[in-house]
Amino acid sequence: CRNMNWTGALYEPIIAGNNTQTLRIYGSLTFIASMTNSFQGKVYFESIEQGNMITCAGKSFNNDVVFQGSGGWSLGDDFTCTRGLIFQSGSFQTMGKNISCSNFISTSGLNRYLDIENSTINLVYLYNNVYYCPWEVNGDNLTLKSQKSNLIYANHNYETFRHYNEAKEYNNIFYNGSPYSGSINGGGCSFNIIQVGVDTVGSLSYNP
């Protein structure tokens, strides 16, 4: 579809589908509070235009959400998906809203503009997810704006942060759960704060 806007819909609508189906949106998306999102498949945002807005109204995505195409997307409110947020190309701006996902993946090497300023990204890893590393980013052809942003880990094992190729500036990383043998492979990136919570059990290695 071009734009999906549920504003004004009556009778508590439900969007449904199994995990073999996909939903492709070529513009903006607006959910409403009275609806239910039971769609289990992947969702693809594939606009070639700027100015697209995503408004979730408290609804979660139940599978990977993929942003690809040369367009631009901004968040109108907080964004939650139980699996991966995959940013392949285009422009993605959080507008100070918060994100919760299992993985944030941006490895394509295509032109990307990523603005997470003033936002918190909660990485709540789903252990049977196909993606190994909760945060994995290829710095080539990427513009990153991260001032006053936070990456918060809750329940991760092994490699938790991987950035490679062109180095970027990140802000804060917090571990509030148990990283166990967690590791940060920084790829030459700079950080403001890397902090492990007082109740966190395990070890964390840092490879700059």
Where are the model-predicted features located?
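Extracellular beta-sheet-rich ligand-binding/adhesion modules
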Residues: 1-208
